[in-house]
Amino acid sequence: MRPVAGRSSRAQFDPMSDTDHTTRRPGPWDLPPEQATPEPAPARKSAPLEDKGQHPAWAIASTLLMAGFLWWITGSVVVAGAVLFGLFVHEYGHVLAMNRLGMGPARIYIIPFLGGLAKGQREPKSEWHGVLVSLAGPAFGLIAMAPFVAVGLALKSPEWLTGAFFIAMINLVNLLPAPPLDGSKALGPVLTRVHPRLEQVALLAVGGLAVWWGLSTGRFILAAFLGIAVFSHLKRGVWRTAWGRLSWPEAGRSLALYLATAAVCAAAAIGALLPLTGGAVEPAFDMGLRFIGVGGR
C-alpha cells in the first residue's frame, strides 16, 4: 500500500544501505529544538595562586643587604644585629596573627634598606581582624629585646642595651598613624567609624608630618619611603575594602589596644635606657627624645 500523497511518511528501510533513515520522535529527555545546541559551560574561576614567599636566594641576599645597611648607619655590629633580629620578630608577630585568623599561611619578605613585610594568602575577614594583625607586630616584637637586655645587664654593656632600645623604637615608630605603617592600619578603621573622611584627612596629615620629621632629622630613606606611601594613598580612590566597618564596641577596643601597645613600647624603650642612667627616669626620657629628634635637654 502506497502512502497517501501530501502527507509525510516514515522513510522506507533500505536493506542495502548502512545508514538508518528512520525518523525518531523527540523523547521526554531530549532538548527542545531551539536548545538543541547546549550552552557552553561557564568558565571556572581559577583559584588564586598560593604565595610561595620570597625566593631563598633573594631572601638571603636581602637579609645581607639589610644587615650591611644597618651596620653602616649604626656603626655597631651589635646594634645592627639587634635591629635585624627585631625586624624578624616584629614581622613574625604579624605572621602568627594572620595564621591564627585564617589569613595564612603567611610569609615574611625582607625589603633591603626599608625593613620587612608580612603577607598573608587572603584578606582579613573583618576590620577587627585587620586591627589585631596590625597590632600583633609591635606587641610581639618587644620579645626581641629580652636577649639584648639580658646580655647588656650581665656584661654591663651599653651597646647591647642600646640595641634593645632600638628594637623598642622600631615597634614604637611603626605605631605612627601614617600610611603604610601599622599605626595607620590599627587607627584608620577607628577614624572611619567616626567619619569616612576623617581617616583620610588625619592619616595624610600625620603622614606629611612624618615625612617632614624624617627630612628634618636626617632620616632621608624613611622620609622617601613615607612620601611614596602617602602619594600612593592620595591616588587611591577607596581606602576601606568591603570588610564592613567596625562596630562601636570594636572601635573602642581597637583604640584601647592601640594606646596600650604604644604605651608599652614607649615604656620598654625608656626601660632599656634606665641602666645607662643609673635608674633615673628623666635622663632616660631625654635620651629617648634626642633619639627621635624632637627635643630633650
Where are these regions (language model features)?
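Hydrophobic transmembrane alpha-helices and their immediate loop junctions
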Residues: 2-297
